[in-house]
């Protein structure tokens, strides 16, 4: 056994000499740190994700039908990363980002890195360069379906390009996944939905870009519009249902329902009321909502308006919910020295 131990020690030293310190280690040598997160900007989604936000150093896919709120969900994550002092990048392959709307959601558009690439290859090369810099906290690619391979753009309109996009995504994710993990960048890929032809049984819906993204994603979110929110006869927003279809960092298949208000984004007041009343933090008696024996309002919209006007009450309920789900028990982010060291390691 001693010969085997000696041989193993020699092999480990050789590996560390060749590939650098930390390239291989025993799991029990160091305390395994909790996964650091970036808040999603939605309390309900933070709860559904199980760890209080999107995991750092992982790939996340957000997909769903058109106008369901996918980009809104991603922009809220960018806003939260910027609030923590992080750097964010948005790769707009669809050329459809509305800076006015992004600003309304809390995104600092002056500091946001924006790229509108011509081809899929260019978009993914830009993403790789940003990740390898080690200086970007979150990257959003909108969308995978719009990452058109160069050969398809330069070809004729009727030409067949079978599997080109799938091969492009597969190759890109093979190169990106390791760098994303080392740099602790959260990479969010927004995707659309397509329907398979001739499917008689089962779900005919699929996402473009092949299967690679499904495999490499640690979290997959399905966003669907549940109903239209109205104030009188006027539509003021949508209720979106977000399902955690895949989760490698916490139990999957949880759901979050959020109010996405037109021009304003996710309503924090609405989700605090819903979750708070489910946990009996906010008491509901008939149509009346109350907190600590103080009435918030009659009807959901009036209670939301009260919370909007009394931010200290909203914050208090918000913190009580986070404490109930133990969402604040996450290790602190790495120091600047460690981040800069990781940047050097990646180069």
UniProtKB/Swiss-Prot annotation:
Q: What species was this sequence derived from? A: Oceanobacillus iheyensis (strain DSM 14371 / CIP 107618 / JCM 11309 / KCTC 3954 / HTE831)
| Molecular function as annotated in GO | ATP binding; ATP hydrolysis activity; ATP-dependent DNA damage sensor activity; damaged DNA binding; single-stranded DNA binding
The source's superkingdom equals: Bacteria
Q: Which NCBIfam families does its entry note? A: tigrfam_recA
Q: What is the recorded function of this protein according to its Swiss-Prot or TrEMBL entry?
A: Can catalyze the hydrolysis of ATP in the presence of single-stranded DNA, the ATP-dependent uptake of single-stranded DNA by duplex DNA, and the ATP-dependent hybridization of homologous single-stranded DNAs. It interacts with LexA causing its activation and leading to its autocatalytic cleavage.
**Keyword Cell inner membrane (UniProt):** no
- Which residues are recorded as binding ATP? 64-71
The alphabetized UniProt keywords are: ATP-binding, Cytoplasm, DNA damage, DNA recombination, DNA repair, DNA-binding, Nucleotide-binding, SOS response
Q: Which family does it belong to?
A: Belongs to the RecA family.
Question: Which residue intervals make up region (Disordered)?
Answer: 328-347
Give a Pfam family name.
Answer: RecA_C
Q: Which InterPro entries match?
A: AAA+_ATPase, DNA_recomb/repair_RecA, DNA_recomb/repair_RecA_CS, P-loop_NTPase, RecA-like_C, RecA-like_N, RecA_ATP-bd, RecA_C_sf
Single Gene Ontology BP term? DNA repair
Stated name of the protein: Protein RecA
Subcellular location(s) per record: Cytoplasm
Is this entry keyworded Nucleotide-binding? yes
Q: Name one GO cellular component term.
A: cytosol
Q: What is the lineage of its organism?
A: Bacteria, Bacillati, Bacillota, Bacilli, Bacillales
Matching entries from SMART domains are given as:
AAA
């Amino acid at each position: 056994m001693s010969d085997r131990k000696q041989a193993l020690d020699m092999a480990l030293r050789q590996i560390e000499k060749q590939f650098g310190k930390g390239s291989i280690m025993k799991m029990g040598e160091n305390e395994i740190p909790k996964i650091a997160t970036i808040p999603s900007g939605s309390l309900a989604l933070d709860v559904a994700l199980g760890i209080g936000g999107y995991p750092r150093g992982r790939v996340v896919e957000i997909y769903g039908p058109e106008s369901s709120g996918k980009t809104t969900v991603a922009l809220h994550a960018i806003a939260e990363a910027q609030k923590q002092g992080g750097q964010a990048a948005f790769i707009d392959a669809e050329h459809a980002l509305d800076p006015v709307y992004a600003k309304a959601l809390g995104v600092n558009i002056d500091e946001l890195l924006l790229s509108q690439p011509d081809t899929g290859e260019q978009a993914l090369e830009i993403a790789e360069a940003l990740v390898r810099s080690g200086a970007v906290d979150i990257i959003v690619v909108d969308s995978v379906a719009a990452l058109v391979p160069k050969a398809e753009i330069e070809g004729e309109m009727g030409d067949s390009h079978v599997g080109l996009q799938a091969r492009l995504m597969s190759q890109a994710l093979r190169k990106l996944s390791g760098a994303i993990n080392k740099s602790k960048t959260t990479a969010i890929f927004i995707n659309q939905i397509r329907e398979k032809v001739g499917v008689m049984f089962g779900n005919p819906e699929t996402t473009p870009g092949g299967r690679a993204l499904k495999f490499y994603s640690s979290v997959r979110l399905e966003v669907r519009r549940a109903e239209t929110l109205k104030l009188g006869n006027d539509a003021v927003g949508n209720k979106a249902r977000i399902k955690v279809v895949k989760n490698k960092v916490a139990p999957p298949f949880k759901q979050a329902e959020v109010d996405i208000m037109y021009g304003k984004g996710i309503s924090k007041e609405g989700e605090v009321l819903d979750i708070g009343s489910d946990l009996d933090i906010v008491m509901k008696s008939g149509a009346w909502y109350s907190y600590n024996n103080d009435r918030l309002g009659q009807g959901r919209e009036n209670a939301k308006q009260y919370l909007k006007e009394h931010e200290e009450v909203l914050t208090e309920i918000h913190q009580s919910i986070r404490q109930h789900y133990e969402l604040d028990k996450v290790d602190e982010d790495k120091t600047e020295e460690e981040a800069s060291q990781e940047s050097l390691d990646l180069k």
